[in-house]
């Protein structure tokens, strides 16, 4: 049966960027990748209440730069910048090179798929009805200016004995259009009945920047229309051939 490709993975290099930008020798690649995973786990654990959406890791020569996209920058920075300085020291110890932390504030969290999925998962863990949580997320996202949204939850919904999947969609979510800016995220809600999976697709419009403009083709030169041989003209030619043959016979 058909399966869906990851909406962000298929758009990398088209309208999406990688979450890690660095180059390494083959011997250093595994080491860098492991440290990236440790950094992401550390930040996800320590900034659980900061509404962190994305973590971008860059490695300029002899240093590291970590950009944290969050809807609550005050929690990350702390009072007089104490928390962010502590974060830099911790990340420097993990990565082994001087680390610089920068904050990217998310202006509209309702248009971020990860934050929307986190909100739904949090409500499910607080025993809010799943239909109410899904509809509320859809309404808030569309009100924030999204072109479309799809929300899917799966598991023992409402404490049912048999797991099932339910989804809501509003607007357009064109997964096959590569220039479409689609944000996608998954989250897990740990409820008393078991784990419930949450998936969110948000269509924020089309990105046309950087694409070659299609010029209008030059009009083709007008050629005289071809005339087909008419029925009478053919009979006249055959008549002339017959007259010439008769002259030769004489």
From Swiss-Prot:
InterPro entries: KH_dom, KH_dom-like_a/b, KH_dom_type_2, KH_sf_prok-type, Ribosomal_S3_C_sf, Ribosomal_uS3_bac-typ, Ribosomal_uS3_C, Ribosomal_uS3_CS. One of its GO terms (molecular function) is rRNA binding. Residues 220-250 have a biased composition (Basic and acidic residues). Residues 39-107 form the KH type-2 domain. Part of the 30S ribosomal subunit. Forms a tight complex with proteins S10 and S14. Pfam families: KH_2, Ribosomal_S3_C. One of its GO terms (biological process) is translation. The gene is rpsC. Binds the lower part of the 30S subunit head. Binds mRNA in the 70S ribosome, positioning it for translation. GO terms for cellular component: cytosolic small ribosomal subunit. This is Small ribosomal subunit protein uS3. PROSITE patterns: KH_TYPE_2, RIBOSOMAL_S3. NCBIfam families: rpsC_bact (TIGR01009). Belongs to the universal ribosomal protein uS3 family. Keywords: Ribonucleoprotein, Ribosomal protein, RNA-binding, rRNA-binding. The keyword Kinase does not apply.
């Amino acid at each position: 049966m058909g399966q869906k490709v990851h909406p962000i993975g298929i758009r990398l290099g088209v309208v999406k960027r990688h979450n890690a930008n660095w180059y390494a020798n083959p011997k250093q690649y595994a080491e860098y990748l492991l440290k990236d995973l440790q950094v992401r786990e550390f930040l996800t654990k320590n900034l659980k209440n900061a509404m962190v959406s994305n973590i971008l890791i860059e490695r300029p020569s002899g240093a590291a730069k970590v950009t944290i996209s969050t809807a609550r920058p005050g929690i990350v920075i702390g009072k007089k910048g104490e928390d962010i300085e502590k974060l830099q020291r911790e990340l420097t110890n993990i990565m082994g090179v001087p680390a610089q932390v920068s904050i990217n504030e998310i202006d509209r969290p309702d248009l971020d798929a990860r934050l929307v999925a986190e909100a739904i998962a949090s409500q499910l863990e607080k025993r809010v009805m799943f239909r109410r949580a899904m509809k509320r997320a859809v309404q808030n996202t569309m009100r924030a200016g999204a072109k479309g949204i799809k929300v899917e939850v799966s598991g023992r919904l409402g404490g049912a004995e048999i797991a099932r999947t339910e989804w809501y969609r509003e607007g357009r979510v064109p997964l096959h259009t590569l220039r479409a800016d689609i944000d996608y995220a998954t989250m897990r809600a740990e409820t008393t009945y078991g784990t419930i999976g949450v998936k969110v697709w948000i269509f924020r419009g089309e990105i046309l920047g950087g694409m070659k403009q299609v010029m209008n083709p030059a009009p083709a030169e007008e050629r005289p229309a071809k005339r087909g041989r008419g029925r009478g003209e053919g009979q006249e030619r055959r008549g002339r051939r017959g007259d010439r043959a008769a002259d030769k016979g004489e």
